């Protein structure tokens, strides 16, 4: 069974992330969504909240296939975490040339550290290219409508956070 590792902060998961996950299931039988835990960062959503939002979003977007996706946390090197979970593929989504430049650099470093793990680049669909979790958080914090950018569960969670 081919296992792919898709790391990110997913704070929150967006339609762009979901698009990449749908594509990832076309190249791997199992995908591990790995939420990076960084002590120096203060995320909007806790790990538990992000994990639940990912599960809810994928159950909606991938009925019957969400069982092929596991959500985990990691706080070490991506390649070490991927290897620990038995992954041989590292999934990276690309929105534009800027993403490609950065991701190519990271892929080179990762390949040097872990030649047994191959990086797969998956291009974002046209509708999800402009979406970033940072922009979603900023727009939502100012009361803007982010319904076109996030799954329904995330929209509800963002609305609840704003009212709190």
From Swiss-Prot:
This is Phosphopantetheine adenylyltransferase. PANTHER family: PHOSPHOPANTETHEINE ADENYLYLTRANSFERASE (PTHR21342:SF1). Pathway: Cofactor biosynthesis; coenzyme A biosynthesis; CoA from (R)-pantothenate: step 4/5. The record marks 17 as: Transition state stabilizer. The gene is coaD. Belongs to the bacterial CoaD family. One of its GO terms (cellular component) is cytoplasm. It is found in: Cytoplasm. Its cofactor is Mg(2+). Substrate binds at residues 9, 41, 78, 92. It holds the Pfam family CTP_transf_like. Its main location: cytoplasm. Its EC number is 2.7.7.3. Homohexamer. It catalyses: (R)-4'-phosphopantetheine + ATP + H(+) = 3'-dephospho-CoA + diphosphate. GO terms for molecular function: ATP binding; pantetheine-phosphate adenylyltransferase activity. Keywords: ATP-binding, Coenzyme A biosynthesis, Cytoplasm, Magnesium, Nucleotide-binding, Nucleotidyltransferase, Transferase. One of its GO terms (biological process) is coenzyme A biosynthetic process.
């Amino acid at each position: 069974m081919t296992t792919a590792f898709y790391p990110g902060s997913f704070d929150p998961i967006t339609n762009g992330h979901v698009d990449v996950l749908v594509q990832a299931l076309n190249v791997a039988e199992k995908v591990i969504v790995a939420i990076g835990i960084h002590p120096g960062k203060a995320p909007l959503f806790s790990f538990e909240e992000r994990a639940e939002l990912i599960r809810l979003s994928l159950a909606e977007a991938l009925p019957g296939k969400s069982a092929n996706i596991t959500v985990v946390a990691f706080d070490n090197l991506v390649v070490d975490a991927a290897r620990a979970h038995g992954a041989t593929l590292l999934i990276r989504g690309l929105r534009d040339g800027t993403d490609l430049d950065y991701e190519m650099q990271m892929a080179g470093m990762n390949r040097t550290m872990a030649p047994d793990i191959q990086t797969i680049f998956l291009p974002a669909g046209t509708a999800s290219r402009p979406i970033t979790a940072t922009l979603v958080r900023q727009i939502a914090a100012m009361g803007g409508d982010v319904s076109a950018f996030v799954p329904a569960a995330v929209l509800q969670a963002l609305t609840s956070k704003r009212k709190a």
